[in-house]
Structure formats: structure tokens, C-alpha cells
């Protein structure tokens, strides 16, 4: 006991020095000043986090006309002026005068209308920057930055979180990480939790998370999937915008690798939480807060690359309702049912009707009347008188001669006509 006392005193002094040197939020990032040795079991129905366990946790609260404040989303403090959160928190609520941000809190009062007390700090919103390509239908690029005023003072319970190094890549594998927030402790809770909750979650392979019986292709390459296949432990409504944090393998710092974005229900089997990965947006963050400010909050020792940069692909093409998953609500479009093993072939389409004729053809000319069959060929070139004489001779059964030709005529017996009188 005597030998351990100096060590404990040194730890307290070290934390005090870090807090003092970090008054301008320019000191080391991702340091947990206080930790629960047992750890919180889960956010949904779990245990409370220790005060100062996650010093970069921020409560984003709607500020009403009568000065009441209502917790809406979580966020991560990056430095004395900037907070990282989710873009969908500001849909329909992007007026800077409607927001107040609370720092260094373990417990918050829903609907509070009184100024916060130390060590808590409250700040106004100077600017809200939503990603230019944020898609509210698919929750693509669900990331935003909030500039606060006046700048925050870091200290015993307030400190900046870390962001991944450029060489880190997307978080993958069976790594255990943490989530925290003031969200609902059960899916149908009447309001968010007043106590900051924490939970340990596992990273889930994106291909498994996107499989047919899970999210069926709705998870994008810039997302991180975290939770458990059986559910039971998850983020919930009110945790949106809060951090997904993984411990650096070479340091004691925690890195914000994801932003709570969306999910179907809370803690359901095969419906884990979906987070916006921070690594693909490092350049975007640097363009807003400055490259030097970003370098200040990146891990000192870059880990070896784990994945290549994600390919750019168009947003998910399934039609989804424009209604947002507010407070981490389930996306309104239900998962499409799994198709049966064998789909019947569709019936053949009927043949198209024959095209109408261009124009009716004229009827063919009538065939010439048949010539009367006769074994007697009349001479050609005879005058009417001679032809008449020839006809008379034929009727009489005589032979006709025109002086040049001699013709034998067959006699045709005609029946005698009898009078009916």
C-alpha cells in the first residue's frame, strides 16, 4: 500500500498537468481522464459512464423561445471552436439561434431553462456546415461541423477527441470499440436519458452487414457497421451525431472513427448501428477547420494502412421516403423481403398487333370472258355482209367458199320451236 501511493499521486498530477496545459484545447487528444473499471454494459438499458470518461462528448440541444433546452443529438469536440456531428440533426433545424451546446456534462436536464453550472459549459452556435453532398434519402455523407462561440476552455472534464490518421484507412476487423450518448435507454422510451451512457460494441464486416437478411445493400462504403448480430446492445434515438470510438493500438488515446448515423429500431438482431466513417472525410474536415487544426487532433503514430480509400459510387438506388430517421429513427422504408428460391417466369407478352396496311390495293381487273368454244374458226378480214352470209350457211349446214378458201361446215340441229298458243 505504501509502495503504490507515490504511483497514484503521480497519476493524479499527470492528469492535472494535462488538463492545465490543455486549457486552450491544443493539448493531447483522445485522453480519458476518468474511466469506469467495470465499464458500462450498454446504452440501451445499460449503466452510466463516469464523469469525464469521454471528455469530448457534447450535447446538442434545441433552444426554444422560452429558454427551454432539449437534448437532440450528440457530438464530438475537435478543438476550442469546432464540434463534429451528423448532418441529419439539422434537417429543418439549421438556424444557429435555435441551438445551444453543452460541454463537460455527465447529467443533463431535458427541458432545462436555467444556465448550466460549473464544470459544465454552454456555448452558442456561430455556424453550421452540412456536407455539400448530404443525401437525406439515403443518409449518404451524413456529417456536419458546428462552429461555436465563444471558444470553449478545455480542462478537467472537457478535452478534444482524436480523428484517424490519413494512412489509417477504414476501421475493419473484429476490433472492439465504444459508443456513448444521452439517447433512449430502450426503443420506446418517452425521452432521452438524463445520464451519459456508454457501451462496448464490435465492428461488423460491411459485407455481412449488407447481406440480404441484414441491411440488404443499403449500407454504403463510407459507413461503419458496429454492434452485435444478436442485438441487445446498441445506440438509439438521441445518440445521433455522437462518436464511435476505438482505442489506438500503440497509444492510450481513443480515436473517433465514426459518427452515429442511423439504424432500424434499437438493439434488434441483425440490425446493428450504422455510423458515418470519419476517415473518408478527413480532407473535407481539413477544408473547413484548417489543415493545422486537423493535424493537432490526429494520432501521433499513424497505423499501417488497413484498407484502400473507398471507391466513389452513386447513392443507394432503392427508392426511400424523404422522411428522415430523426433522433436515430429507423429509416421509413422497410427492408425488401427476401426473394423465394425460384421465381416463376413471367408470362410471355402478347404479340404486337399487325400494322395496318399502308393503303388498300385496287381490285384486280376481271378476267376476260371466255371465248365460245367452236371447232369452226371464222376467217379473218371478212366484211359484215360476208360474215352474215357465212353464219347463214353454217346454220344451213352448207359449205362456204370465199373464193380463196374452202370451209366444211358442221350442221347444228336446232330443236323445233313449238307454239304455246
Swiss-Prot record:
Enzyme class, UniProt record, top EC level: hydrolase
One Pfam family from the record: Trypsin
Positions of disulphide bridges: 25-154, 29-162, 73-89, 177-246, 209-225, 236-266
Comp. bias (Basic and acidic residues): 397-409
Transmembrane segments: none
GO molecular function, one term: protease binding
Alphabetically ordered keywords of this record: Disease variant, Disulfide bond, Glycoprotein, Hydrolase, Protease, Serine protease, Signal, Zymogen
Activation/inhibition comment: Inhibited by SERPINA5.
Catalytic residues, chain numbering: 88, 142, 240
Disordered as annotated region, ranges: 297-316, 327-383, 397-421
Signal peptide residue numbers: 1-19
Oligomeric form and interacting partners: Heavy chain (catalytic) and a light chain linked by two disulfide bonds. Forms a heterodimer with SERPINA5.
Described function: Acrosin is the major protease of mammalian spermatozoa. It is a serine protease of trypsin-like cleavage specificity, it is synthesized in a zymogen form, proacrosin and stored in the acrosome.
Name of this chain's protein: Acrosin
Protein source organism: Homo sapiens (Human)
Lineage, top ranks: Eukaryota, Metazoa, Chordata, Craniata, Vertebrata
Amino acid at each position: 500500500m505504501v509502495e503504490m501511493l507515490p504511483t497514484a499521486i503521480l497519476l493524479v498530477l499527470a492528469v492535472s498537468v494535462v488538463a492545465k496545459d490543455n486549457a486552450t484545447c491544443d493539448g493531447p487528444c483522445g485522453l480519458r481522464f476518468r474511466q469506469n473499471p467495470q465499464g458500462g454494459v450498454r446504452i440501451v438499458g445499460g449503466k452510466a459512464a463516469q464523469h469525464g470518461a469521454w471528455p469530448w462528448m457534447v450535447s446538442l440541444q434545441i433552444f426554444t423561445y422560452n429558454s427551454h433546452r432539449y437534448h437532440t443529438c450528440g457530438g464530438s469536440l475537435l478543438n476550442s471552436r469546432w464540434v463534429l456531428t451528423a448532418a441529419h440533426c439539422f434537417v429543418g433545424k439549421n438556424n444557429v439561434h435555435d441551438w445551444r451546446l453543452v460541454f463537460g456534462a455527465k447529467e443533463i436536464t431535458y427541458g432545462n431553462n436555467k444556465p448550466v453550472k460549473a464544470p459544465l459549459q454552454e456555448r452558442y452556435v456561430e455556424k453550421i456546415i452540412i456536407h455539400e453532398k448530404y443525401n437525406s434519402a439515403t443518409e449518404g455523407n451524413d456529417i456536419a461541423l458546428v462552429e461555436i462561440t465563444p471558444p470553449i476552455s478545455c480542462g478537467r472534464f472537457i478535452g478534444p477527441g482524436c480523428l484517424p490518421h490519413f494512412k489509417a484507412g477504414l476501421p475493419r476487423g473484429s476490433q472492439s470499440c465504444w459508443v456513448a450518448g444521452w439517447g433512449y435507454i430502450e426503443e420506446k422510451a418517452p425521452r432521452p436519458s438524463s445520464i451519459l451512457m456508454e457501451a462496448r460494441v464490435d465492428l461488423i464486416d460491411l459485407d455481412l452487414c449488407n447481406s440480404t437478411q441484414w441491411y440488404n445493400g443499403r449500407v454504403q462504403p463510407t459507413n461503419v457497421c458496429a454492434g452485435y448480430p444478436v442485438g441487445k446492445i446498441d445506440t438509439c434515438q438521441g445518440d445521433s451525431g455522437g462518436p464511435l470510438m476505438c482505442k489506438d493500438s500503440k497509444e492510450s488515446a481513443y480515436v473517433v472513427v465514426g459518427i452515429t448515423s442511423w439504424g432500424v429500431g434499437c438493439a434488434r438482431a441483425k440490425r446493428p448501428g450504422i455510423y458515418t466513417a470519419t476517415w473518408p472525410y478527413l480532407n473535407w474536415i481539413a477544408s473547413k477547420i484548417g489543415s493545422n487544426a486537423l493535424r493537432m487532433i490526429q494520432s501521433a503514430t499513424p497505423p499501417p494502412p488497413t484498407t484502400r480509400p473507398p471507391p466513389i459510387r452513386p447513392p443507394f438506388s432503392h427508392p426511400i421516403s424523404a422522411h428522415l430517421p430523426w433522433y436515430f429513427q429507423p429509416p421509413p422504408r422497410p427492408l425488401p423481403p427476401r426473394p423465394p428460391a425460384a421465381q416463376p417466369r413471367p408470362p410471355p407478352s402478347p404479340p404486337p398487333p399487325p400494322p395496318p396496311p399502308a393503303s388498300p390495293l385496287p381490285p384486280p381487273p376481271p378476267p376476260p370472258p371466255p371465248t365460245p368454244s367452236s371447232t369452226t374458226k371464222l376467217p379473218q378480214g371478212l366484211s359484215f355482209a360476208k360474215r352474215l352470209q357465212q353464219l347463214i350457211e353454217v346454220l344451213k349446214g352448207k359449205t362456204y367458199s370465199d373464193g380463196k378458201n374452202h370451209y366444211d361446215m358442221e350442221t347444228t340441229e336446232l330443236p323445233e320451236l313449238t307454239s304455246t298458243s
